[in-house]
A protein has these predicted regions:
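Transmembrane and membrane-interface helices of multi-pass
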Residues: 1-3, 11-12, 18-166
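Serine/threonine-rich low-complexity intrinsically disordered regions
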Residues: 2, 19, 31, 35-38, ...
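Solvent-exposed soluble domains appended to multi-pass membrane proteins
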Residues: 185-445
Length: 445
């Protein structure tokens, strides 16, 4: 009987122990699930914080380095070939934006863990709710600000408007005036519908001037400076034909799809703004606006020998495809020039060749071209490129601002080159076009 009583007590104790173990196990599971839930929430909000900080830092970095650019410009640059890009710009973004955003996000995690240990459960729960709300609100505000700053929604609306001119080699209409679908302010005259002829035609020298605008003129001539930084170019403009948006010296007003180098080249070359789908075509099918008829195509049909000369790499942003697929016979870029010439370190910059050296070599190329018959020599400068431009050994130290000295140097270089052209036998039968590719991206201007 005693044994049965003892056995019953043992069974009872075992049941109690089993119940306690189950309760303990359930409690541990709840704690584990709670910890897992908190970890997931912490991870989610850390990612949101990272995106938030990344957006903020990116906005600041882009504004400081490129000024008021738009979303399509950023997207086109990311999608198009980047060979020849100034690596200092890439490293600057990695360090100042990505790394800084990552470090601040890690500090956020440590801050949350510190508050969790120091605050009571009730206080921490309140802080967690308020913090989560604040994070979501700031993310929404960041997204709204980014859209307002870069016209992201407008870009997608713009992209939804289609035209075959970018990607099909065919006539779209046979009307005299063909409207380009994509911007109601643009009336596109299809060159396929126009008879272009002429026997006594001129040679063409077409020079894209990096980041040139009338800001650097004095107020008397249409700029904002007390002293004219471009006296030589001012005289050239006054003595020859110039086009302006005002009664003073000015120029074309840029619009969507024309405000960075390859976009400006494309719009001047084709009469059309650049769209991001062109970058997709380059990436997928290795082609650049096969549906457009360009200046290069027209001159090629009329027997011109055509050459492009640039101090950077021709592959950048698809420059080689734009010109070689539309009538040009040759491109001289930094790589091909290095094979033919040797350069000193003070003749090079982060993008390639200094402009003074480029103008020297341009004289050799034009002299050879002039012996072949009618020619189109196109070139692009680089020294005024953002954010600070590139000083060369000929740049004056006239102004306190480095950028103004570079523009003054450009004015002298271009004027000297024009003087050389005037001394050549082919000058009287040559049209020279000087045009800024886009407004400067340097923030102070």
């Amino acid at each position: 009987q005693k044994l049965s009583i003892i056995a019953a007590k043992i069974v009872h104790c075992a049941k109690i122990a089993r119940c306690q173990f189950l309760l303990f196990f359930i409690d541990k599971c709840e704690v584990s699930l709670l910890k897992k839930k908190n970890k997931i929430l912490l991870t989610v909000f850390t990612i949101i914080i990272f995106i938030n900080i990344l957006l903020l830092n990116s906005n600041i970095w882009i504004y400081n380095n490129f000024g008021n650019v738009k979303f399509q410009e950023i997207l086109f640059t990311l999608l198009s070939p980047t060979s020849g890009t100034d690596t200092s710009v890439i490293f600057s973004y990695i360090i100042r934006v990505i790394v800084v955003s990552f470090v601040l996000s890690i500090l956020f995690i440590f801050g949350v863990l510190y508050l969790r240990r120091k605050c009571s459960s009730k206080a921490f729960k309140y802080l967690k709710c308020m913090g989560s709300l604040l994070i979501v609100i700031t993310l929404i505000l960041s997204l709204l600000y980014t859209n307002n700053r870069y016209d992201v929604v407008a870009y997608f609306n713009y992209q939804s408007q289609k035209t075959t001119i970018y990607n099909k080699k065919k006539k779209v209409h046979k009307k005299k005036n063909t409207e380009y679908i994509g911007d109601s302010t643009i009336i596109y005259q299809n060159p396929e519908d126009v008879k272009i002829s002429g026997d006594n035609t001129n040679n063409l020298i077409y020079i894209y001037l990096e980041s040139f605008e009338n800001t650097f003129l004095d107020t008397e001539n249409g700029g904002i400076k007390n002293v004219n930084c471009l006296p030589e170019l001012t005289e050239l403009a006054k003595q020859n034909t110039n086009f302006s948006n005002t009664d003073q010296l000015g120029g074309a007003l840029p619009f969507t799809g024309t405000t960075w180098t390859i976009a400006s080249m494309t719009s001047q070359f084709t009469g059309l703004p650049l769209k991001v789908e062109v970058a997709n075509d380059m990436d997928q099918q290795n082609r650049f606006m096969p549906g457009a008829k360009t200046i290069g195509d027209i001159l090629n049909e009329n027997g011109y020998i055509q050459e492009l000369m640039i101090g950077s790499q021709k592959e950048f942003a698809g420059t080689d495809k734009l010109f070689l697929q539309h009538g040009f016979d040759k491109i001289c870029d930094i790589n091909s020039l290095k094979q033919e010439y040797s350069f000193k370190s003070n003749e090079l910059n982060q993008w390639g060749l200094d402009d003074y050296k480029l103008f020297e070599l341009a004289k050799n190329e034009i002299t050879q071209l002039a012996q072949t018959g009618k020619f189109n020599f196109t070139m692009a400068t680089i020294d005024c490129h953002m954010p600070k431009g590139f000083l060369c050994k000929y740049c004056p130290n006239t102004y306190e601002n480095r950028y103004e000295n570079i523009y003054a140097c450009q004015s002298k270089l271009i004027n000297s080159f024009i003087d050389w052209c005037k001394s050549q036998s082919w000058y009287e039968n040559t049209t020279i076009v000087l045009v800024g590719d886009h407004p400067t991206m340097a923030q102070q201007y």
